[in-house]
Swiss-Prot record:
PROSITE patterns on file: RIBOSOMAL_L9
Record SUPFAM superfamilies: L9 N-domain-like, Ribosomal protein L9 C-domain
Gene3D superfamilies for this protein: Ribosomal protein L9, C-terminal domain, Ribosomal protein L9, N-terminal domain
Protein name: Large ribosomal subunit protein bL9
Keyword rRNA-binding: yes
InterPro entries cross-referenced by the UniProt entry: Ribosomal_bL9, Ribosomal_bL9/RNase_H1_N, Ribosomal_bL9_bac/chp, Ribosomal_bL9_C, Ribosomal_bL9_C_sf, Ribosomal_bL9_N, Ribosomal_bL9_N_sf
Keyword Ribosomal protein applies: yes
Family: Belongs to the bacterial ribosomal protein bL9 family.
Any one cellular-component term (Gene Ontology): ribonucleoprotein complex
Described purpose of this protein according to its UniProt entry: Binds to the 23S rRNA.
Amino acid sequence: MQVILKEKVENLGVLGDIVNVKPGYARNFLIPFGKAVQATKANIETFEAQKAELEKAEKARFDAAVATAEAIKDKVYTIAAQAGEGGKLFGSVGTAEVAEAVSQASGKEIEKSQVRMPEGVIRSIGEFELTIHVYTDVDADIKVNVVASEA
């Protein structure tokens, strides 16, 4: 199935590209999330008329993402969690806790799906390096310091 991309999609293309994808990927992901439209003759003509407007909106989203990344990168965010002897946590610190801590400290809205934890959830006290995937091609490296809570 051919679709016209309305924004940059990782491993697929950029705004305005006409690409071939599997029908299920188009119907279940690209089209419902507003990332693409089916490449019919009418849609191609409509897209060409709106291309400048869409590029301007994409640039605004990208600039906002870069500003967010600059505001949160290279900082240390502290999360308090209950811990036992030896620094082992009761439970774990996951993406939701990291996203909440970064959002509260920076004032920028970060979703838990944007937090990248390559080694999985944090289960001990210490300082850990994580990545926040703000937007396509925009990542911010942060440090999370997990400390024992006073409980």
